């Protein structure tokens, strides 16, 4: 008592404007009751109070209140700063910030950090508690400590202050990921700029956040970090929309069982459980249940768990009670050899029963429950989370425990197999996910047995599913035939992704009448029968706008001819991808060009990495003639990865005299010749004539792959694309016409054509510029004045 009172008197006599008290985090074996009993004989530095998310203000005027730990407040309330009183009359307002580490020393659980600091200060002759306070800025430190900054003010200042301070600082483990993200995206030049504008960054700039859990060692400090993080999410950072928890090691968990079960998993659970603002959650590479390799196989064979000998592993949880054995009614699928139960009570192959009831008392409150019953979430993304048979049952039981009116996107990429598809189909058929629009089930090893359940899901009229992704599974033509009836009944599905499956040799192809986007990338559609069935489907479809047939080896003349006939009939397609199909002038290119001349709806086509040479380029040049451009001008033509030379390029750009603005965008990979090539291009530009009436403006943009994605994503205050605004400025500066009704500023007259010629045979930009013809003006019959149609052409090299 004397020692503590002397310290208080010294602190009052000095009347410093601010002091800093450093305390250590608690361990899980600390007893709060014993600490209160021995508080009279314990100094401030030796006390290790448990941290909580919110501390209640302590209004007790007892002289020993400064040595007592704050009361615990477990409920989420307001984010007011905590206040405490001492024997002096000066109130103290405390604000708590937390910093975590990138690398920490190997400390034991019972290590007292205060004793270590006091010894270091004694060696350096520094005071242990009194330091100057400066402006708090997030910095990358190398120790895991919790710093409490106390600011002393007068009683009059406290009475005049009515608003509480707000904590604008995230823990360092979160700050580090934001800094790396912002520097990588180019929003800031270096990490110092991010720290300087940290408040602005947290409040307005950050929308997506990835957390990798690197170098986590102390369980108590990480628990406190998660509490501070949850408080910050719900009180300050309203612009944050997505949080991702990612295992950087992919198929291995480089943490012991103790740390994963007591540090990482509780961190994720706290964020999901108390979430009030975040709409999108992603978990990639982490199991969503406790792991214990000795008692159960909860990790996939691809996972590798590294055990730590320095930390005792947690005792294995008691084994779950055996599930009730219920005799199942059977409905035999057409191609399945096992009994399948589809009723109000679903029994899986392991004998577990999935009931649809609203009683949540029997469901364990873990990450499964918090994910599926958090009605703030609109998107759940689970990839490679190591679900075994028991985990599948627990997850889908939690998902079926109540009706969800907020979840719009569900992504499960974790090899859930046919058993998981059976459990999910019961939930979808009963329409427990009322507003689900997007369902992605790629890489789940689905077979034709899953196609049977998918057919029932597609046949459900109450389910308003718009996007279905079944890529990278094992469904073949027989499974697609089983789903044919569901496609015919479904009226809401707009996008179907069936890439990397086994469509095989079948002419029975029908994806329904409501499909607008169809992706059959790398699905073995190159056979004569499958192309015949697909062509027949395209002829009678009146809704499809996008078709992806890349990597299907459709290089035969008969296959291209059959597909071209469907293009000539269909008048709704806008984008077609025929990349990597060995198409050339000898194998169907003439038929393809003829059909595109008849079809006036297709404005974008990709012929990347085929066998197109100069002869084929001459055939493709027919797409830019006057009649085709009059009805529906092309906007995009991808010819990259082919063998087009100067002769073919000259034929392709022969009709560029219609355009007044030409962008030649190329990618120069030779760093040593950058200056040389740039000087050559500038000299060629100077040699071009720029007259008032017949001119052709040329703009060179180097390194297309580095600049174009940024230009296309950033808009100005007027809502226009920066590239379009730049074009309009060049056009306006080159015109001498003072007529206010001129069509120069009309955006409808500014169209865009992109021709991608990258990765072809060497094409020198200086020669390409010389091939561009001049602009030819046209006269109108009404006023006999020249009218310019300002259009944009982009040649990509």
From Swiss-Prot:
Residues 1-20, 51-103, 125-148, 307-333 are annotated as: Disordered. Keywords: Leucine-rich repeat, Repeat. Residues 313-326 have a biased composition (Pro residues). Residues 82-103 have a biased composition (Low complexity). SMART domains: LRR_RI. LRR repeats lie at residues 376-397, 406-425, 435-456, 464-484, 492-513, 514-535, 543-564, 572-593, 601-622, 633-653. InterPro entries: Leu-rich_rpt, LRR-containing_regulator, LRR_dom_sf. Residues 55-81 have a biased composition (Polar residues). Residues 1-12 have a biased composition (Basic and acidic residues). The keyword Repeat applies. It comes from the Eukaryota. Coiled coil: none annotated. Several proteins derive from AAC-rich mRNA, which, due to a frameshift also have ACA and CAA codons and thus are Asn-, Thr- or Gln-rich. This is Leucine-rich repeat-containing protein AAC1. It comes from Dictyostelium discoideum (Social amoeba). The lineage of its organism: Eukaryota, Amoebozoa, Evosea, Eumycetozoa, Dictyostelia.
